[in-house]
Amino acid sequence: MVEELPSVFLVGPMGAGKTTIGRLLAKQLGRSFVDSDWYIESQTGADIAWIFAKEGEAGFRERETRAIDELTQQPQIVLATGGGAVMAAENREYLKQRGIVIYLNAPVDVQMARTAKDKSRPLLQQPNPRKILQGLYSARDPLYREVAHIIMPTGHTYPRHMVNQLLQQLNSFCISTSVDSEPEKD
């Protein structure tokens, strides 16, 4: 199954566990793991907060779209996208058409707990981060669902257990997809 599995792309809000789950999943699948934010940082030589400060969110999103385009063309990788990657229609198309998209769905309380002390998230450097997270979740959840082939709730189980569940779902997804694409026999 693993050899036939296309690239796997993780989407979801900040704090959903995309990087943690992505690393573990890549290890289990014997694949390379790439985090799109880290990729952007390595390409620019600057961290995301600096890019936001100098170029604004629009400048960052342009860089993100170029990165998503490049990364989704790589064969058999596990990619963790930034939380806002789904905001651009181009990115949603790249993700949906070039691999299997897994939406790691984390409730706002889980996001708050995981991001509370993280100063590297520019969108949360506001007086009321909970309100920001709630607004982002409301705006982005339908877009995550639009691109997702698999939806996995996060925050209530250990990462290794979640990866085992994902492997089962990926196996089921691949089996059902191959059955659906086989020509009918007379």
Swiss-Prot record:
Major subcellular location class: cytoplasm
Annotated GO MF terms: ATP binding; magnesium ion binding; shikimate kinase activity
Locations listed in the record: Cytoplasm
Chain sites annotated for binding Mg(2+): 19
Reaction catalysis annotation: shikimate + ATP = 3-phosphoshikimate + ADP + H(+)
Cofactor note: Binds 1 Mg(2+) ion per subunit.
Pathways per UniProt: Metabolic intermediate biosynthesis; chorismate biosynthesis; chorismate from D-erythrose 4-phosphate and phosphoenolpyruvate: step 5/7
Pfam families cross-referenced by the UniProt entry: SKI (PF01202)
Domain of life the protein comes from: Bacteria
Binding site for ATP: 15-20, 121
HAMAP family: Shikimate_kinase (MF_00109)
UniProt protein name: Shikimate kinase
Organism expressing this protein natively: Psychrobacter cryohalolentis (strain ATCC BAA-1226 / DSM 17306 / VKM B-2378 / K5)
The organism's taxonomic lineage, starting at the top: Bacteria, Pseudomonadati, Pseudomonadota, Gammaproteobacteria, Moraxellales
